Amino acid sequence: MHGAPKYPAGFTHFNYADPNAPKGGRVVLGQTGSFDTLNPLIIRGEPVAGIREWVYETLMARGFDEPFTMYGLVAKSVEMPPDRSSVTFHIDPAARFSDGKPITADDVIFSMETLRERGRPNHRNSYKKVVRTDRVSDLAVRFVFDASGDREMPLIMASMPVLPKHLLTPETFERTTLAPIVGSGPYTIAAIDAGRSITYKRNPDYWGRDLPVNRGRYNFDEIRYEYFRDMSVQFEAFKSGVLDVRTEDDPKLWASGYDIPARRDGRVLTREIETGLPAGMSALAFNTRRPVFQDPRVRRGLLLLFNFEWVNKTLYHGLYKRTESFFERSYLSSAGRPADARERELLAPFPDAVLPEVMEGRYRMPVSDGTGHNRENAREAFRLFSEAGYVIDGGRLVHKDTREPLGFEILAGSSVQQRLIASYVSDLAKLGIAARLRVVDSSQYQSRLKDYDYDMIQTAWPSSLSPGNEQVFRWDSRNADVPGSFNFVGVKNPAVDAMINRLLEAEGDEDFTSAVRALDRVLLSGHYVIPLFHASRQWVANWKQVQGPKTFSLWGYNLDTWWIDGQK
């Protein structure tokens, strides 16, 4: 999309994959919660882990060591005019579903039309920009795009999963199902224990095993996901050897939980993996659809009352860094950078959308002295609450006109979130704010998330160096009231919409970077979330028979490039 591909025509394999990696063995991974469907492409149900990665294939494969390039997979070649107004995919004649049926243009067209009409909101939003579909031949399809100028659309279509038309109808597609799904990917479904586990088996007849994008990947004969009721039980399963690999996101466990005999004698390995990706945004997210959070002064005040320095020291062994941007840890971040001329031009039609300190690069998350008091930030927070109409009455913060207390519920879907949220709730209670924590099971949490039935949640929006149409799904006004979107906050901001459009229209690296930074500034100025923290590296633990490559991609840990060492 921007720049030149990293790999030339005729390349043999991705640099982060070892073409000599041995095949064989089984790897077992852990998941928390449960599942009730094998279909991850619809909004209904709680999908099982792994279908998208192991069973379905997309038209083209992403290169994980560059942000804007995809290479041939189901589509052997692609044609595109300079203005990116259309894209033509030429299907590899060898491409097959796991039942042996060839993949044809009819499967590709069926996939697009079905996902556009009945898929998840992100598919519906993106594929509706296809205004015409041409069946060029049995093995070629052309998609023609609308006049919106979205230059990412060829990559969006290249990322589309290909569904078997001979096994599905639009009606059967949108049902939740536990019947094994047929795809064209490297694995098939070998066993299902509803809600408890799923096992994938490497397909010995996989049509694409020798493609350059696949060499050195998909090395395990079996991949099994075991489900556990909570993270603590899952961690015990790893320590006892039931699970083979674990990605850790709990600093307390990383700091001390892996001091076990198996690690001390070398049977368990821990590693910290560098990643070239932005850290993304992990945050406490306000549901601005709720009246209590519609005043940005209230949101800013609550942000000021989050005592990161104390939380990091007390709960997380000081292992986290504060997140200052939606594109933290990358050149796309606006933090500490004054807006350039391009950004100012983009933002000029929205003079009130960005705070002066954000525009000038002076904005920072509030800092405390690391004690449990946070007095200076509390004084500024109460000034903002007062401006918003709140007063102290009998030790409670209430609105001076309605007498409604400043109070809300923070919804959590796992016990892991309880420590942080309970700490924040306790701090707010000392200041007369009636926050409360509610923990529900995974199924109920996902259901309430889809319907925006919460006041506040702890959530995360991952990021990459190629932000695009996923930003529409997260922040655009059109998705604020669409069930199942990732616009958890309910953002309805014309400046946000405009900046997303500009990043999608950008033709060069500089224009793209300026548009992303401008979007970052508008989101930060809106105080839609309380930014939390991030680790500087990925934390991965594994039993030593599971081995990984010496070179990692920008994305860091990718299980599909690991293997079993039979000697260990």
Give the residues covered by each predicted segment.
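Surface-exposed binding/hinge segments that line
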Residues: 90, 125-168, 184-193, 338-353
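Gly/Pro-rich hinge or "lid" segments in bacterial periplasmic/extracellular proteins
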Residues: 56-66, 113, 157-217, 221-224, ...
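A structural "hinge/loop" feature
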Residues: 13-14, 33-50, 74, 101, ...
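N-terminal lobe/hinge region of extracytoplasmic solute-binding protein
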Residues: 1-83, 90, 113, 180-182
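Aromatic- and charge-enriched surface segment that lines or borders ligand/interaction sites
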Residues: 17-22, 42-50, 77-121, 136, ...
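Extracellular/periplasmic solute-recognition and catalytic clefts
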Residues: 132-135, 190-201, 226-290, 297-301, ...
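Detector for C-terminal structural segments
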Residues: 31-33, 47-50, 54, 193-198, ...
